[in-house]
Amino acid sequence: MAREFSLENTRNIGIMAHIDAGKTTATERILYYTGRIHKIGETHEGASQMDWMEQEQERGITITSAATTAQWKGHRVNIIDTPGHVDFTVEVERSLRVLDGAVAVLDAQSGVEPQTETVWRQATTYGVPRIVFVNKMDKIGADFLYSVGTIHDRLQANAHPIQLPIGAEDEFNGIIDLVEECAYMYGNDLGTDIQRVEIPEEHKELAEEYRGKLIEAVAELDEEMMMKYLEGEEITVEELKAGIRKATTSVEFFPVICGSAFKNKGVQILLDAVIDYLPSPLDVPAIKGTLPDTDEEVERKSSDEEPFSALAFKIMTDPYVGKLTFFRVYSGVLNSGSYVKNSTKGKRERVGRILQMHANSREEISTVYAGDIAAAVGLKDTTTGDTLCDEKSLVILESMEFPEPVISVAIEPKSKADQDKMGTALSKLSEEDPTFRAHTDQETGQTIIAGMGELHLDIIVDRMRREFKVEANVGAPQVAYRETFRSAAKVEGKFARQSGGRGQFGHVWIEFEPNEEGKGFEFENKIVGGVVPREYIPAVGAGLEDALKNGVLAGYPVVDIKAALVDGSYHDVDSSEMAFKIAASMALKAAVSKCNPVILEPMMKVEVVIPEEYMGDIMGDVTSRRGRVEGMEARGNAQVVRAMVPLSEMFGYATSLRSNTQGRGTFSMVFDHYEEVPKSVSEEIIKKNKGE
């Protein structure tokens, strides 16, 4: 089967936003206008095509990024719908990694919100070009230019409107196209009666002002256009389009457009903008990777002629076909039934069937080409972030990094039958989601699950019940505290046991010191002259790593410290790896009195939106939760409070906010960093963990 769409005519885009900005509705409308859906599903009726897991339809939020393919004006557009809820940032992170461009959806009333900032930061990390779609122009309080202002203020992004709305709220009935200097008027809310007309007289002055600003902004990034502009020459529509495209694909400029997906206004123009301004796989830099044996850097160009290489970015369990591996092809061609190498794991895999997905329906295809996104059936060992490549031309593409979980709960099956199924369910779910972990607590024997927030774990438990028929009781949430050292010291660990026959002997001197935040544990061997034989050195490192997992103060993992083995002694007969492991853990215990250990807690960036009259109560409440208020501003007729609050103080906040504001307040939070716990709180945590 020959390639249906050329690489130039392929777009791989993501749709990203804060929860409730109308992202899934926008995707739905795109699928509707590109002919993939016959009846539109409304999110608030629980009928959306992209949200196909039961919980997504119930909660009206998107949890897993469904990958869908659509066609528009001779182009193939592969769309990944990403979740806007903060607990699912891993989904956003994975999809951004494999996209060439993205549409950031904003709510016209709120502009940039906290999760928008998080997602925007992730997109910047991966160098993803973006268009901004200011949605919900029909909503009360919609303000396009305010929203554009928030992009400058909060994201420090070089964003400029390439459209202006005609009217707002109930009066929103048209869009001015600043590039083509025309307007589109909507005769109804069905998107069927659209007329291209001249810009209405009363809007001409504003349109001219903003077109001038647009040309100036684009010319600043394009020398040729700048010369023409300065010499007062006319800049043609084609030149302006080419300038916007070049500046957008190089991530120096972000075009802003507007509309109301729900009212079917602006969606076709959004699709045109995706084609006009977002890059094809040929416009983005060739993907870099390394050779498995030598770590030498190589690149793979977007071409069917190059050897096959792809990145697995999502694993899903499908009730009918089993495990689905979603992957993005960067180079070469793959046929179903062929063998590939998983170079990350060094395993050979057979690709059974290849499916192209449309939300929750699928079409079987025999071949995928460079630039395509598809799902494979039959890959046994592949997990998120693995590279798949041609067996004769190995490469490891740069993988993704996922944050550590910040919250955990104990979970126990309700019956013996549930217990057997729970193990399978948890291993499948953690295979799908790298930020979800499950382990058994050695001391209590309880199963502990950990994730990125309360909603994340709620949904995991929910999926266990629905998909795997496992009924379980869930304990109270626990915060993932960490421990670290604040000062350096040299300490001794000596383990000697003599009880007839062969004894045990290990003796070490270790220098501990704080490490930079986020650097983790680093072990260094500074032994000279063989006072500790070389074969026992790894045992010292391993002994420390094991001991660090169980903490020194309250049983939480110790992070961000350096340990150097500087001296020690051994016994010809009695020394063993085990003895040195134990000596190392004894040294860590001895460090407690000298290295000033402290407990660290996860801090959350919180944004609360409330009516003005509740401002005092909310500020007091945030402070009582050990929060630091970092900023306030008016947004329409509401007030926004931004604060940094410890996660441990945020449990049950939704209920408290509801009662404090008669249900009129909303909040969102995202993990930010770890910070030292105050002494009084630290003592409480230690007491609680010792069962006092």
UniProtKB/Swiss-Prot annotation:
Places the protein is found: Cytoplasm
Gene3D superfamilies reported in the protein's UniProt record: 3.30.230.10, 3.30.70.240, Elongation Factor G (Translational Gtpase), domain 3 (3.30.70.870), P-loop containing nucleotide triphosphate hydrolases (3.40.50.300), Translation factors (2.40.30.10)
Chief location of this protein within or outside the cell: cytoplasm
Keyword Lipid metabolism: no
Lineage top rank: taxon: Bacteria
Cellular component terms (Gene Ontology): cytoplasm
InterPro entries registered for this protein in UniProt: EFG_II, EFG_III, EFG_III/V, EFG_IV, EFG_V, EFG_V-like, EFTu-like_2, G_TR_CS
Domain tr-type G: 8-282
UniProt-annotated binding residues for GTP: 17-24, 81-85, 135-138
This protein's UniProt keywords: Cytoplasm, Elongation factor, GTP-binding, Nucleotide-binding, Protein biosynthesis
GO terms for biological process, alphabetical: ribosome disassembly
A family per Pfam: EFG_C
GO MF assignments: GTP binding; GTPase activity; translation elongation factor activity
Entry similarity comment: Belongs to the TRAFAC class translation factor GTPase superfamily. Classic translation factor GTPase family. EF-G/EF-2 subfamily.
Purpose: Catalyzes the GTP-dependent ribosomal translocation step during translation elongation. During this step, the ribosome changes from the pre-translocational (PRE) to the post-translocational (POST) state as the newly formed A-site-bound peptidyl-tRNA and P-site-bound deacylated tRNA move to the P and E sites, respectively. Catalyzes the coordinated movement of the two tRNA molecules, the mRNA and conformational changes in the ribosome.
Annotated protein name in UniProt: Elongation factor G
